């Protein structure tokens, strides 16, 4: 009321001169009325872009130039209101209906509007375009509301939190051409009446919770140009054959929505279709030859299904094809030669099938290929010379085949090349000149082949611009020295040259590679000295020089590497004493000095006391370990040194005690000050009026109801990120309330957290715990989630919940949790890295369906807590942490993949990540590898003994996926999208 009175006086003060002169024109009155409506709208906003400061009553004469406002030239009525991307939060005032009937365009997309869509919106009878996408609107869309909006042409409600059934009144809108209801929580079936749209060209219902069959009636909308029905809907049945009647269709997307059955041959009637997405379903049968009639097709993706048979030759009619994806199916036969003759083909991905024969000899000759992935098949023969004919090739992946012969020399001049993975083949010949030094190459894998010759020296000097981060040439027959030009690979992080025939002195130039994380030069013929320049590789964490002929001593400069945790120099010819300085490397947890000619005594300092006896065996002149103790005089001198150190330590302790005592008195005084401040803030915190509640869907409770849950007797869990309480709202809804660790007061991170929570609140996926609301004041942040009655996977597997998970339930949990992570990694923009994937963060619903929880919060714990706490928050939990974190202190989505692999091993074995595995210091990953020898058939040795009648093929496949996920090198791990694909295909017969 006060706001309205204030607005009235503003209007009065601005027009009082006009009143006095009796000169108010109808035009001015209209402008004032419309300005008043916009001011009412602005007052309902909680926050907005500063550009909306132009909206003020004294400025009413320039109403039509206000931000986002457009008018007609005749009577200055507002016809368009565009408030998109203005950082607006809050609600929409009912006053908006007063802009009818002149308003024809309303766009409020990409903001943070919340609450229900006001019914007054439906009163905008002249509206032609309504775009409310990418907000946080909730509740149901009125069944009859849209029937008033008879002029509507475009309705875009994508990416909100609407729920309930799809609104039926939309079918009465005869002018409607564009309808997007995707990215919401609509449930139930698609109404058959949706087939009665008269003018519809664009229909998207993807990304909801729709069930049932796709109605055949949709085929009656023959005006359709684009149709999107996939992504996380869960349909029964298959693709309606009647869709072959949608002759105007250009884009058909039915991906990832549980479709079964065969691909209808009738789809071949869609002559205008340019994009067909059917990937990630459960489609069976063969690829219909009739698809070759879709002569306009540019994109065909049938990947991650259960398709069988051969690639039909009739697909040669797809002369406009640019993307051809058939990967992760059960296809066999040869790759037809016509594939290499498709003139516009850019992306070809046929990996993980059973293709045999040769790669088409002319592949790449069209000059347009950008990406080729034919890995994990049974291909033989030579690699075609023409792959990079057009100098556009960026990705070449052919690993795990039976290819032989030389590498095409032309690949050494393929400058766009970014990823090059040809390991696990039978390739011979030398490395093409220039290949290692290509300017854009990031990953080079040629391990496990029969390559010969020397590693080429860079002649042109272009390597200084190299992007190469990983080289794997291990297990070949390469010979000669490492070229000095390796110093120019400044971005190199991983250098794997083990199991070759390389010789000569290891070049000191390697010390200039400051980004190196791992070096493996074991099992070669290197001689000469250990280069002291290695000590300049300050990021190095792994160094293996074993099984060579290196002599001299280990340079003390190595001790400068503060994060080195693995050092292996065994089976060489080192012949001097072990440097004491190595003992001061607290990071060094594993070292092997065995089978050399080291002399003297083993240092007793620092880390040397932790190394096993086997680390020193085979050194006849070395004493000081259990198998070869030193003589008495040596022991006596060591004892005297120890006494001197103890005396020095006592003096240091005395000085430190005085310092700490003084600091303690100061701290005691500060405690009283802090307690007084805390007491004052607690009094303020208990006032619900200071709390702000942001809902991400329709809420049946208020902030005071949430605060009632935050009591000690409601605690159901405590962790590194806060305390979790269970609560029951007035409407009977059960919720979980997470109280986050206290954020630094006045920190600039507060706004960052609030903004991130807004992003997390918009995430919608059936396998992700739904964030219902965010409740906060200046001191405390509370997250309100849907409650999961069966607790966490960790509690069920390892706790005392009294629940035993059958194998089929475990496999289903694995698949559903993978889908949740896949959504975070691949379908969120920007992608979200979980940062703490573990079994305790996978919650189980009433039917034991998996929901990923606690995602996206760790980086705020990093920002707002001390360094000691942030380490665990960022990296994850003990037993789940990817090995590269130890030396990079950075994580990415592949870190999540590693952690998920650990969860899979928990599901298979029923054991904790860190358990009693019979040997100190090993975890579930190491134990599983030891027990099975990394062989999938060995899964029977580690399977949970409580399980019976397990499908052997399923267990083997799930273990295979787990082993891929926990690969030591992150680049070798699959993406979560690939993990979903592999687990989806794991279900097989044959039990044991």
From Swiss-Prot:
Keywords: ATP-binding, Cell membrane, Developmental protein, Differentiation, Disulfide bond, Endoplasmic reticulum, Glycoprotein, Kinase, Leucine-rich repeat, Membrane, Nucleotide-binding, Receptor, Repeat, Serine/threonine-protein kinase, Signal, Transferase, Transmembrane, Transmembrane helix. Induction: Accumulates upon CLE45 peptide application. Accumulation is promoted by CRN, especially at later stages of protophloem development. A motif (CLE45 peptide binding) lies at residues 226-231. Glycans are attached at residues 28, 75, 87, 131, 163, 220, 256, 293, 354, 440, 472, 525, 568, 575, 597, 613, 631, 635. LRR repeats lie at residues 75-99, 100-124, 126-148, 150-173, 174-199, 201-221, 246-270, 271-294, 296-320, 322-342, 343-366, 368-391, 393-414, 415-438, 439-462, 465-489, 491-513, 514-536, 537-561, 563-585, 586-610. It comes from Arabidopsis thaliana (Mouse-ear cress). InterPro entries: Kinase-like_dom_sf (IPR011009), Leu-rich_rpt (IPR001611), Leu-rich_rpt_typical-subtyp (IPR003591), LRR_dom_sf (IPR032675), LRR_N_plant-typ (IPR013210), Prot_kinase_dom (IPR000719), Ser/Thr_kinase_AS (IPR008271). GO terms for cellular component: endoplasmic reticulum membrane; plasma membrane. Its main location: membrane. It is an enzyme of class 2 (transferase). GO terms for molecular function: ATP binding; identical protein binding; peptide binding; peptide receptor activity; protein serine kinase activity; protein serine/threonine kinase activity. The lineage of its organism: Eukaryota, Viridiplantae, Streptophyta, Embryophyta, Tracheophyta. Residues 1-21 form the signal peptide. The chain crosses the membrane at residues 657-677. It is a single-pass type I membrane protein. Residues 22-656 are extracellular. Expressed in seedlings, roots, leaves, stems, inflorescences, flowers and siliques. In roots, confined to protophloem and sieve element precursor cells. This is Leucine-rich repeat receptor-like serine/threonine-protein kinase BAM3. It is found in: Cell membrane; Endoplasmic reticulum membrane. Residues 678-992 are cytoplasmic.
């Amino acid at each position: 009321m006060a706001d309205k009175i204030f607005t009235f006086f503003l209007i009065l003060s601005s027009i009082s001169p006009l009143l006095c002169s009796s000169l108010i024109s109808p035009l001015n009155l209209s402008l004032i009325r419309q300005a008043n409506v916009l001011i009412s709208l602005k007052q309902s906003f909680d926050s907005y872009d500063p550009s909306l400061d132009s909206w003020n009553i004294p400025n009413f004469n320039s109403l039509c130039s206000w931000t986002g406002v457009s008018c007609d030239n005749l009577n200055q009525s507002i016809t368009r209101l565009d408030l998109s991307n203005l950082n607006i939060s809050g609600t929409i005032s009912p006053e908006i209906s007063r802009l009818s009937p002149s308003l024809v365009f309303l766009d409020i997309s990409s903001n943070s509007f919340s609450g229900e869509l006001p019914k007054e919106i439906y009163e905008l009878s002249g509206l032609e375009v309504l775009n409310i996408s990418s907000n946080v609107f909730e509740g149901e869309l009125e069944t009859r509301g849209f029937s008033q909006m008879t002029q509507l042409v475009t309705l875009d409600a994508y990416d909100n939190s609407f729920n309930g059934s799809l609104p039926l009144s939309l079918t009465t809108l005869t002018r409607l051409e564009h309808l997007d209801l995707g990215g919401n929580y609509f449930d139930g079936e698609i109404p058959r009446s949706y087939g009665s749209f008269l003018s519809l060209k664009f229909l998207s219902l993807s990304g909801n919770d729709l069930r049932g069959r796709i109605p055949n009636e949709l085929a009656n909308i023959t005006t359709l140009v684009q149709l999107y029905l996939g992504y996380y809907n869960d349909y029964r049945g298959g693709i309606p054959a009647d869709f072959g009647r949608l002759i105007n269709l250009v884009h058909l997307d039915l991906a990832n929505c549980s479709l079964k059955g065969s691909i209808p041959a009738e789809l071949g009637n869609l002559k205008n279709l340019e994009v067909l997405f059917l990937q990630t379903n459960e489609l069976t049968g063969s690829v219909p030859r009739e698809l070759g009639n879709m002569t306009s097709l540019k994109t065909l993706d049938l990947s991650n299904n259960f398709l069988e048979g051969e690639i039909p030759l009739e697909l040669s009619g797809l002369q406009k094809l640019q993307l051809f994806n058939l990967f992760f199916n059960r296809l066999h036969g040869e790759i037809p030669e016509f594939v290499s003759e498709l003139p516009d083909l850019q992306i070809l991905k046929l990996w993980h099938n059973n293709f045999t024969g040769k790669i088409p000899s002319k592949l790449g000759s069209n000059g347009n290929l950008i990406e080729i992935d034919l890995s994990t098949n049974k291909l033989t023969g030579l690699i075609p010379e023409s792959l990079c004919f057009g100098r556009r090739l960026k990705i070449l992946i052919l690993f795990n085949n039976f290819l032989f012969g030389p590498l095409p020399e032309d690949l050494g001049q393929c400058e766009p090349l970014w990823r090059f993975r040809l390991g696990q083949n039978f390739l011979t010949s030398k490395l093409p000149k220039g290949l290692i030094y290509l300017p854009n190459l990031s990953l080079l894998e040629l391990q496990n082949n029969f390559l010969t010759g020397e590693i080429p020296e860079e002649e042109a000097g272009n390597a200084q611009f190299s992007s190469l981060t990983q080289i794997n040439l291990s297990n070949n027959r390469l010979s000669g020295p490492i070229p000095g030009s390796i110093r120019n690979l400044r971005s190199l992080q991983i250098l794997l040259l083990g199991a070759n025939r390389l010789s000569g002195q290891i070049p000191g130039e390697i010390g200039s590679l400051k980004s190196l994380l791992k070096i493996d030069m074991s099992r070669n013929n290197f001689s000469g000295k250990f280069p002291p320049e290695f000590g300049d590789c300050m990021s190095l964490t792994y160094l293996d020089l074993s099984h060579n002929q290196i002599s001299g001593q280990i340079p003390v400069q190595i001790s400068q590497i503060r994060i080195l945790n693995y050092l292996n120099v065994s089976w060489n010819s080192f012949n001097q004493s072990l440097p004491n300085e190595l003992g001061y490397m607290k990071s060094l947890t594993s070292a092997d000095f065995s089978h050399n000619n080291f002399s003297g005594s083993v240092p007793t300092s620092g880390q040397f006391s932790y190394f096993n006896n086997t680390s020193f065996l085979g050194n006849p002149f070395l004493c000081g370990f259990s198998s070869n103790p030193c003589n008495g005089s040596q022991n006596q001198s060591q004892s005297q040194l120890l006494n001197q150190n103890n005396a020095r330590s006592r003096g240091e302790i005395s000085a430190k005690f005085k310092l700490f005592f003084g600091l303690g008195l100061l701290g005691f005084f500060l405690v009283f000050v802090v307690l007084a401040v805390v007491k004052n803030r607690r009094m303020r915190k208990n006032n619900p009026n200071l709390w702000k509640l942001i809902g991400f869907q329709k809420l049946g409770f208020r902030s005071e109801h949430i605060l009632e849950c935050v009591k000690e007797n409601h605690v159901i869990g405590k962790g590194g990120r806060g305390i979790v309480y269970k609560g029951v709202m007035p409407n009977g809804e059960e919720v979980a309330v997470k109280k986050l660790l206290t954020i630094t007061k006045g920190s600039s991170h507060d706004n960052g957290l609030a903004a991130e929570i807004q992003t997390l609140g918009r995430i919608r996926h059936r396998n992700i715990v739904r964030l219902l609301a965010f409740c906060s004041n200046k001191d405390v942040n509370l997250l309100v989630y849907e409650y999961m009655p069966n607790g966490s996977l960790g509690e069920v597997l390892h706790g005392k919940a009294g629940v035993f998970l059958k194998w089929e339930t475990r496999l289903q949990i694995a698949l559903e949790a993978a889908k949740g992570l896949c959504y975070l990694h691949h379908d969120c923009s920007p992608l979200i890295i979980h940062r703490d994937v573990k079994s305790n963060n996978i919650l189980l619903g009433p039917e034991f369906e998996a929901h990923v929880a606690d995602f996206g919060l760790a980086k705020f714990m990093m920002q707002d807590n001390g360094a000691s706490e942030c380490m665990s928050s960022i990296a994850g939990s003990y037993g789940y942490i990817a090995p590269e974190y130890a030396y990079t202190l950075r994580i990415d989505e592949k870190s999540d993949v590693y952690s998920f692999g650990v969860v899979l091993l928990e599901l298979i074995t029923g054991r904790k990540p860190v358990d009693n595995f019979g040997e100190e210091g090993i975890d579930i990953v190491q134990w599983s590898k030891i027990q099975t020898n990394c062989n999938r058939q060995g899964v029977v040795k580690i399977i949970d003994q409580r399980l019976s009648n397990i499908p052997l093929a399923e267990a083997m496949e799930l273990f295979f996926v787990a082993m891929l996920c926990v690969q030591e090198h992150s680049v070798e791990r699959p993406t979560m999208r690939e993990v979903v694909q592999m687990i989806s295909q794991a279900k097989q017969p044959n039990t044991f």
